[in-house]
């Protein structure tokens, strides 16, 4: 699967990120593959299980920023919603929002693992 096809599969904004990175598909590919090593999702999941709202907020905020920079609109939107919930130091409803993050994260990772 090409990088563009990968972005289409996950519902992300390939053209925007390609433009921001000077039109280099090789650079986009190199950066998005690094996402697979990013630990912010795992940290978010762990901190939510521990009911640590401050650390969960930091992890959600980091994930949101990475997704914004990589043009992963699908994952950015849901991680942004969770970030705002946690910014208010609220865990009430965070589990439901995390399930949306988890769904989009899994879609994103599955697409990235199919890159040529």
Language-model segment annotations:
Residues 1-58, 62-116:
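Two-component system phosphorelay core
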């Amino acid at each position: 699967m090409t990088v563009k096809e990968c972005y289409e599969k996950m519902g992300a904004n390939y053209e925007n990120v390609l433009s921001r990175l000077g039109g280099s598909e090789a650079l986009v590919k190199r950066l998005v593959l690094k996402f697979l090593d990013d630990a912010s999702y795992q940290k978010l999941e762990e901190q939510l299980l521990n009911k640590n709202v401050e650390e969960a907020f930091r992890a959600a905020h980091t994930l949101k920023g990475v997704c914004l920079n990589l043009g992963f609109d699908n994952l950015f939107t849901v991680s942004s919603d969770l970030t705002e919930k946690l910014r208010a130091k609220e865990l009430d409803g965070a589990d439901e929002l995390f399930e949306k993050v988890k769904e989009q994260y899994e879609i994103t990772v599955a697409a990235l693992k199919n890159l040529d």
